[in-house]
Curated annotation (Swiss-Prot):
Its cofactor is pyruvate. The gene is hdcA. Keywords: Decarboxylase, Lyase, Pyruvate, Zymogen. One of its GO terms (molecular function) is histidine decarboxylase activity. The proenzyme is a hexamer of identical pi chains; each pi chain monomer is cleaved to form a small (or beta) chain and a large (or alpha) chain by non-hydrolytic self-catalysis. Substrate binds at residues 64, 82. InterPro entries: His_de-COase_proenz, Pyr-dep_his-deCO2ase_N, Pyr-dep_his/arg-deCO2ase, Pyr-dep_his/arg-deCO2ase_sand. One of its GO terms (biological process) is L-histidine metabolic process. It is an enzyme of class 4 (lyase). The modification Pyruvic acid (Ser) is found at residue 83. This is Histidine decarboxylase proenzyme. The keyword NADP does not apply. The active site is at 198 (proton donor).
Length: 311
């Protein structure tokens, strides 16, 4: 048992999050899960479709395409949480199946917190990649949410269309859509919650390079909001990881950009050497394995190697 879990157990908290299903993860609080904990991950993606004469259907299909891009969360009943992963939680790629890229990462910049400490800000791509590796993609599905399951998610999104004639552009329309997610890890996870911050917007010029520059500015704005939220609760964070997704639209297309942090339990057959009879040991196994070690033990090829994933 980790030192953190030993401390939490004394407070009556367990972070066990095991699904009785084979292959599929299940949503936090679904009946039959083992343990009172949850596992979360970071997903930001964007999808498009050609515009039809039905705005509602266009929104449904473009949202579905964002859900099924990269880390596969298709066919779920998504319910909305606020934006915290607290004493019951672990994050894929960080707390379990840790990505080596997390330990190699260098801060992009720092933000001063209410207590005078500096909060290092990192690119969240290693954590985004980690969720893809665990859930799999639409074409290569691994331990994704069970079809039709009820998955609690921290989520936000934006939908916008690009008219066939750019001269007809109206407020709320644009050339692209983008989304962003941040996870900030509490310095003292026995006292404070780690925190998600989500953002999304419409891009109103045809220049993609300018959008990328703009998103770097959004990262600084998000870092400032993280520090301010920490001040409100007198909570300090040890690091923040911020990632983006975007898509540019062709004339006559509609785009949807989403930011999602699903709260799930882990199927036992995704845990090498795991047993439904020893859920506490199962969580320890996943905590002690790095992502490359897990991929090797499961016989999976990396989906994110060589920067293969675009968000």
């Amino acid at each position: 048992m980790s030192e953190l879990d030993a401390k939490l157990n004394k407070l009556g908290v367990d972070r066990i999050a095991i699904s009785p299903y084979k292959q599929w993860t299940r949503g936090y609080m679904e009946p039959g899960n083992i343990g009172n904990g949850y596992v979360t991950g970071l997903k930001v993606d964007a999808g498009v479709r050609d515009k039809s004469d039905d705005d509602v259907l266009d929104g449904i299909v473009s949202y579905d395409r964002a859900e099924t891009k990269n880390a596969y969360i298709g066919q779920i009943n998504m319910t909305t949480a606020s934006s915290f992963t607290g004493v019951q939680g672990r994050v894929i790629g960080y707390d379990i199946l840790r990505s080596p890229e997390v330990d190699k990462a260098k801060p992009l910049f720092t933000e001063t917190q209410w207590d005078g400490s500096e909060l290092p800000i990192y690119d969240a791509k290693p954590l985004q990649d980690a969720l893809v590796e665990y859930f799999g993609t639409e074409q290569d599905r691994r331990h994704y949410p069970a079809p039709g399951s009820f998955i609690v998610c921290a989520n936000k999104g934006v939908t916008a269309e690009r008219p066939k004639n750019d001269a007809d552009m109206k407020p709320g329309q644009g050339y692209g859509v983008w989304s962003a997610i941040a996870i900030s890890f509490a310095k003292d996870p026995t006292k404070d919650s780690s925190m998600f911050v989500e953002d999304a917007g419409v891009w109103e010029t045809p220049n993609e390079d300018e959008l990328l520059e703009y998103l770097e500015g959004r990262r600084k704005a998000m870092a400032k909001s993280i520090a301010e939220c920490g001040q409100d609760a007198h909570a300090s964070f040890e690091s923040s990881w911020i990632g983006f997704a975007y898509t540019m639209m062709e004339p006559g297309q509609i785009g949807n950009a989403i930011t999602v942090a699903p709260y799930v339990s882990l199927p036992i057959d995704s845990i090498p050497g795991g047993s439904i009879l020893t859920p506490d040991k199962d969580m320890e196994i996943m905590e002690n394995l790095t992502m490359p070690e897990w991929l090797e033990k499961m016989g999976y090829k990396s989906l994110s190697a060589n920067n293969a994933l675009k968000y």
